[in-house]
Amino acid sequence: MGIFSIANQHIRFAVKLACAIVLALFIGFHFQLETPRWAVLTAAIVAAGPAFAAGGEPYSGAIRYRGMLRIIGTFIGCIAALIIIISMIRAPLLMILVCCVWAGFCTWISSLVRIENSYAWGLSGYTALIIVITIQTEPLLTPQFALERCSEIVIGIGCAILADLLFSPRSIKQEVDRELDCLLVAQYQLMQLCIKHGDSEEVDNAWGDLVRRTAALEGMRSNLNMESSRWVRANRRLKALNTLSLTLITQSCETYLIQNTRPELITDTFRELFETPVETVQDVHRQLKRMRRVIVWTGERETPVTLYSWVGAATRYLLLKRGVISNTKISATEEEILQGEPVVKVESAERHHAMVNFWRTTLSCILGTLFWLWTGWTSGNGAMVMIAVVTSLAMRLPNPRMVCIDFIYGTLAALPLGLLYFLVIIPNTQQSMLLLCLSLAVLGFFIGIEVQKRRLGSMGALASTINIIVLDNPMTFHFIQFLDSALGQIVGCMLAFIVILLVRDKSKDRTGRVLLNQFVSAAVSAMTTNVVRRKENRLPALYQQLFLLMNKFPGDLPKFRLALTMIIAHQRLRDAPIPVNEDLSVFHRQLRRTADHVISAGSDDKRRRYFGQLLDELDIYQEKLRIWEAPPQVTEPVKRLTGMLHKYQNALTDS
């Protein structure tokens, strides 16, 4: 396929984007809005953003969800701007500086919340800055400007959603059904590898791939939930299926680790059962039936606990999978599974990274303010707006430098493209609404094709071109003003890029260490006799952290193995029959406090001291378990955990 070719699957979304832009333009001029450009720009960004992220037409619900986030972010930003202006109207410089700090604060928050919701916080940061900068000459018009901006943005979002509904968006349901089947087959094949106890690298690749696929399925669940309220039952089942899939991975990997020291635990009967190859979910179903019969014949005590748990989880997976595919009423058996254990959310390990993002956004906005005041450039405010937009959006993504480069390419491409529209197309079409709409529809169509290909600069070019062409009411054509706006965008993106290069993010190693220590803390916290605490389901949170670790350190197998071992230890200790008495309960609380001190320690020396204290306490705990005659199901996992912590002490304490 050539660089300028158009694939059939890209045409529908390109038409959808063109329709959203035309609707926003027509409504903006029909209702005599002062700046219809904001409505058009919002419609374009809301529609094109999910397509750029997905690398194709987004699934149903994605555009609506992004639109709702944009409305929320805009209202938060407008309220913040009004509060800042009312409080500091007599000190304009201080007012702008506080807005810069507000933009940084919103970026900090957006770095800590879920990636889907971070868009609203990033938007609220630069919305307040845009309002404060725009009303510098006429501060008394602030409420009117904020209201107009909110109205125009709501109109733009409404147009994007209407266009999405008109062109029958894709449903993700079929993809979910297909992935559920494939995932169960892959889970069975992973257990086959673990039973064979073959090459460790092959096993690592298999479970790593399953962790990624389970995370992707959770993302599909979020999309399905946004799509329609009729998938509420499927959404509940998919939440439980996420935990079951992670349980299957954990039990398979524990089976592999057990065979390192006690291969005789896996009997020949189960080895023969797992030698049968499977290709489809029906094959897996037949094999599970055979295994359940074997377990009934041999008895639960003669079955390795990991295999017994794996077969039970796979059976529940099959039951819920059928319910997701049919979307029927939830049965009593399913309800019992769904009413299982409350899922625990873990604290973010990226606090230092979030603080770096705060300083990047704040410093770049302050630098833009100083540049504007020092040069007195009429488009310095435009440069400041671009700085805030780029840094607020770039900081939420794994590679902010590439986002900045995308914006730089986009603003550079917008200069000749905007020039064509400003000098030739719009002056010759402004007398006819039909021709004006057609001209912008052509722009939206062709950029919509490139956005789906994730062409570098395409998203930036779309937003920057609409921002600089004359779409105000009434239209005025001042070439110097156009050139200033175009150059202001380019300068703003370049200043943001310079700040991102200068303020380096060295938080990667710290984040990795915090993640590993959080795994240790989770394993330690599983040693409890508190019934409520033992029922807490930390597995999704732990695997979410493991997925983050895999993204931060691709290919670092020792880190992944250590994290997985801690997850296995957590699950085993959580189900272990720990003796119930006050002496052990008090010591459990002491162990948790020490583990928390390891995570929160501000220096390597403190961390080493607390970690050494934790190891000493674990030795004392083992002695207490011996005194209280704890069974091997308790003492062996604690011994394995203590041995792992001794072995990896340096990796868990050094920066």
From Swiss-Prot:
GO terms for cellular component: plasma membrane. Its main location: membrane. It is found in: Cell inner membrane. One of its GO terms (molecular function) is transmembrane transporter activity. One of its GO terms (biological process) is carboxylic acid transport. InterPro entries: PHBA_efflux_AaeB/fusaric-R (IPR006726), PHBA_efflux_pump_AaeB (IPR023706). It is a multi-pass membrane protein. The chain crosses the membrane at residues 13-33, 38-58, 69-89, 93-113, 121-141, 152-172, 370-390, 407-427, 431-451, 460-480, 482-502. This is p-hydroxybenzoic acid efflux pump subunit AaeB.
